[in-house]
């Protein structure tokens, strides 16, 4: 069975701004008109569903982007998203695969820096892309045991990027051109595996393992500015204490970061020149070690 769809969206966004703290004289009155079409095909053949789609998406910059780009006003970003894949289902297992190519024009990417309140700053890059494959496997060994495994492999690149370094010797900025570099804070490999044990209708126990590959703190693909890869294990249990027609009580217990791994999933970097020497400062947001969480959820219907 072959089916198709077409989705047409038109958006109008108006920006009005009467300056802000660092640039009180910046007066903005801009209107963005976006046409976002999407179309796709799918074909159902017994246990397999094939699909393909293409979509255009436009997105306006946000207030933080204006504050980060005092000299040059940020542009809207445009995306053409191509996707294709399949879903294969059987009573005891299922396999999904999805290929994608996201072609950006003027993508607003993280710069690796933060503003005066600690929020990440973004800038437009003329040409960039994100491409990859997503795979997911679900398998039920029996009524009590099941597992889900997913993996994402991607390449996230900026075709051309200019890095600006503050030079305190000359009171100016040094521009460094980079070609075909990785987009900041974009891991190339991420995996997730969940093992579920359900001994009865009241109790479910989940063991989740997540892996994130190394990431770059900024868009220079500099090996001295990275976030290390990490592997996490979490265990959580859900126990349904009471399940009535109008009243449900659920007890949940979580053990996060079971192996007490020291890791930082986010951070920022800043480089400057002083006394003819370049200094780079990498800063990290470390997460908690092993931690516990107990909750009681009550639903009234």
Report the location of each language-model feature.
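Residues on the lipid-exposed face of transmembrane beta-strands in outer-membrane beta-barrel proteins
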Residues: 1, 39-45, 84-88, 133-139, ...
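Transmembrane beta-strands of outer-membrane beta-barrel proteins
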Residues: 4-8, 37, 50-52, 95-97, ...
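Gram-negative outer-membrane beta-barrel transporters
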Residues: 13, 101-103, 123-220
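C-terminal beta-signal and adjacent terminal beta-strands/loops
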Residues: 103-105, 147, 155-157, 213-216, ...
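Surface-exposed extracellular loop regions of Gram-negative outer-membrane beta-barrel proteins
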Residues: 1-22, 29, 32-83, 94-95, 151-153, ...
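Outer-membrane beta-barrel channels and translocator barrels
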Residues: 1-3, 44-48, 89-93, 130, ...
């Amino acid at each position: 069975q072959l089916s198709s769809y077409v989705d047409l969206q038109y958006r109008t966004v108006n920006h009005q701004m009467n300056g802000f703290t660092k640039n009180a004289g910046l007066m903005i009155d801009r209107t963005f008109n976006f046409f976002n079409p999407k179309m796709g095909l799918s074909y159902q053949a017994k246990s397999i569903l094939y699909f393909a789609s293409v979509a255009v998406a436009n997105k306006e910059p946000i207030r933080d982007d204006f504050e980060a780009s005092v000299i040059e006003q940020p542009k809207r970003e445009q995306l053409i998203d191509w996707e294709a894949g399949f879903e294969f289902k059987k009573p005891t297992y299922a396999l999904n695969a999805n290929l994608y190519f996201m072609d950006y024009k003027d993508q607003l990417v993280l710069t690796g820096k933060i503003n005066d309140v600690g929020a990440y700053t973004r800038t437009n890059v003329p040409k960039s892309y994100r491409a990859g494959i997503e795979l997911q496997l679900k398998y039920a060994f029996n009524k009590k045991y099941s597992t889900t495994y997913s993996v994402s492999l991607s390449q996230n690149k900026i075709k051309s990027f200019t890095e600006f370094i503050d030079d305190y010797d000359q009171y100016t900025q040094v521009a460094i051109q980079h070609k075909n570099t990785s987009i900041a804070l974009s891991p190339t490999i991420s995996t997730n595996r969940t093992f579920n044990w359900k001994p009865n209708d009241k109790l479910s126990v989940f063991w989740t393992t997540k892996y994130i590959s190394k990431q770059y703190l900024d868009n220079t693909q500099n090996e001295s500015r990275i976030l290390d890869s990490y592997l996490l294990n979490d265990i959580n249990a859900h126990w349904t204490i009471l399940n009535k027609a109008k009243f449900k009580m659920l007890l949940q217990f979580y053990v996060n970061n079971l192996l007490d791994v020291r890791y930082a999933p986010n951070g920022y970097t800043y480089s400057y020149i002083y006394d003819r020497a370049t200094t780079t400062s990498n800063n990290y947001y470390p997460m908690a070690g092993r931690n516990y969480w107990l909750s009681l959820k009550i639903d009234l219907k």
